[in-house]
Amino acid sequence: EATLSWRSVAHHFQLDGARAVVADIGGGSLELIGAVDGLVEATASLPLGAVRTTETHIAGHRDMPKAIEGLRRHARRQLRKALPWREWTAPVLIGSGGTFTNLGRMAVARRGLPVPDSIHGSRVTTAEVEQLLEWLATRTAEQRRHVLGLNVERADIIVAGLAVTAELLDLADARELTVSAFGLREGLLLEMAGATPQLPSDPLLQAALLVYASD
């Protein structure tokens, strides 16, 4: 899965000469890829998906700040094992998957700007992630369903996803992250098409990538 995420990101971002960390938060796992100058040097799959961590650390807890604190400690322990972070501090950090696309849309909305149809390539600061996490933690799941920029289907799991994201940013000492609207499904399409790490020239493949952009 990490390899598929990387194929997708490498098609949409110029990473030559950069030290990059790509994160894809799914339902059950977090896929991490560390790359230097466009070449993958490390990968990890951690049990830190948004659904899994909601079930293990968030669901049923009345004291949300305490639950989030516990999840963040758990995430930090897992993340420390994933990469030699002393070698990966302050990287270009790219997030793909629904947690990140929803984060991007909410961040734009919180700035008082119109939420665009595509959030691909937008940037969210670490401070914005922390502020959104703190704010969403004070809302019930029903209230989160009405948050501008948040897909109602993610109202139950967004807090856990952002808690993991916040720890990732902190551990990487990154000031911001860049949102990719393309993830595992797109990586699979690219692999099936035998595409190289450039934007595909086939218009049918381009259309398929747009249709399956993460929500």
Regions found by a protein language model. Give the residues of each.
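Helical "lid/coupling" subdomains associated with nucleotide-phosphate turnover
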Residues: 1-19, 34-36, 42-215
